[in-house]
Amino acid sequence: MTRRDTTRVIRPATGPERTCKSWLTEAALRMLMNNLHPDVAERPEELVVYGGIGRAARDWESYDKIVETLRRLEDDETLLVQSGKPVGVFRTHADAPRVLIANSNLVPRWASWEHFNELDRKGLAMYGQMTAGSWIYIGAQGIVQGTYETFVEMGRQHYGGDLSGRWLLTAGLGGMGGAQPLAAVMAGAACLAIECQPSSIEMRLRTGYLDRSTDKVEEALAWIEESCAAKTPISVGLLGNAAELLPELFKRGVRPDLLTDQTSAHDPVNGYLPAGWSLERWHAMRDQDPPQVAEAAKASMAAHVKAMLDFQAAGVPTVDYGNNIRQMALEEGVTNAFDFPGFVPAYIRPLFCRGVGPFRWAALSGDPEDIAKTDAKVKELIPDNPHLHNWLDMAGQKIRFQGLPARICWVGLGDRHRLGLAFNEMVAKGELKAPIVIGRDHLDSGSVASPNRETEAMRDGSDAVSDWPLLNALLNTASGATWVSLHHGGGVGMGFSQHAGMVIVCDGTEAAAKRVARVLWNDPATGVMRHADAGYDIALACAREKGLDLPGIL
């Protein structure tokens, strides 16, 4: 089992020529490779895409076998992938998914990091995060609009909708957290982001998500102060450890206008540097003594959360951004760790009630012009949404593509299928140079059960009910998605979430149009269904408006 290979540089093919037998399998191959593009993946030599140890394949041998199998897969066959390893090819039919993926799923009683890490060391499992192991990660852009929407809503609730002259304090500049600086600036706020790994800061600078960086606290604060005074937002990366710096900043009397965190606290062994430790010690001890690392990391998380609670008590709007750091602190004795809310119940749930979530697409041509054309098509089909148009304009100006050109765009039930059908027609007419892949984050309205994040504080108390993502995956499979994934532990770590993903390919054919119409209606409709079942009035109204048949609910 080879987990590290520094000799490989993976980039997807581009253009109209295929190496697979159909565009459906070619799309899966290109998106798998795109996840490992050096401008996309955090540690591509280790197959790690983002989120601590979120991988695209279990090991390099498995990666090679997946590539080989996709290239020979027939139009009526389906590849099964078990925790990043290809395990079977079976005859199905043309409208069935070409790939079905299950990553890091464990029987609940055994669903702990300790048991998973034991399996991982034996080569029996792989952590897929959300979009790492499901081959639809598009770099930091994949989370940037959701982060932007959250910051805009924070500004609306706390500052009358105006974040100019204000600033956000946060930590974590990995594959997810790396979206924060750009999202804050796009929302009108300056951002100071603490990050312990120089490589993560360098990647955000290189890809345009961060404006400048320093390892000096005074310099960072001076830049933020100047930015706020001029009402010209900038983003600053500060090299350091959040567990050390947040308490220090509070003691100094520093008071940001907004506070959150996106360190990889979900994984106490691989994701969070203990206070007082060097990177070298951390990397060595992760292999030598994982329990000691976890113990030290969780103690540091407790200090981190205590500082966040101090800021909140001082009047700073504070929110958990879904990395499970509150749970880790609670287990370390911080009994009031959940006094600050998660971002979904605080700011995002009304969108989920209408099936609105992180719709994304990528241009298999590799040509940015194809994304520009699809952006224009979105505006044409949804003409009466100035907020969405503003987002697309900003994205076109400020977001640099990582790997294959792609776009994230939060839309919901009734719009997703219209956009998909329009993209498919553009491919059919030759307006786009190659097919389009449409997917989404597993963080969506009907595809996840995560009591400390997406399903926190559900109205009916159904936070931990995970039937919903299972039903979502089953329905997407029956509807004809090109590949479907079912994962455990993404975002918040082992034992705390189950979630499903889907991808559909627009190859310009009539058969694709039928699949697109089914999948991109049914997928967001499950989100409306899930929230209607929980008793949310917005979801119930949406279900009635869209004519959903929900016999046990309506």
Swiss-Prot record:
Disulfide bonds: none
Its EC number(s): 4.2.1.49
GO MF term list: urocanate hydratase activity
Broadest EC class assigned to this enzyme: lyase
Catalyzed reactions per annotation: 4-imidazolone-5-propanoate = trans-urocanate + H2O
CC cofactor note: Binds 1 NAD(+) per subunit.
Keyword NAD: yes
Residues that coordinate or bind NAD(+): 51-52, 129, 175-177, 195, 241-242, 262-266, 272-273, 321, 491
Subcellular location, record wording: Cytoplasm
Cited InterPro entries: Urocanase, Urocanase-like, Urocanase_C, Urocanase_central_sf, Urocanase_CS, Urocanase_N, Urocanase_Rossmann-like, Urocanase_sf
Residues of the signal peptide: none
BP GO terms, sorted: L-histidine catabolic process to glutamate and formamide; L-histidine catabolic process to glutamate and formate
DNA-binding recorded as keyword: no
Source domain of life: Bacteria
Function recorded in the entry: Catalyzes the conversion of urocanate to 4-imidazolone-5-propionate.
NCBIfam families assigned to the protein according to its UniProt record, in alphabetical order: hutU, PRK05414.1
Record's protein name: Urocanate hydratase
Source species: Caulobacter vibrioides (strain NA1000 / CB15N)
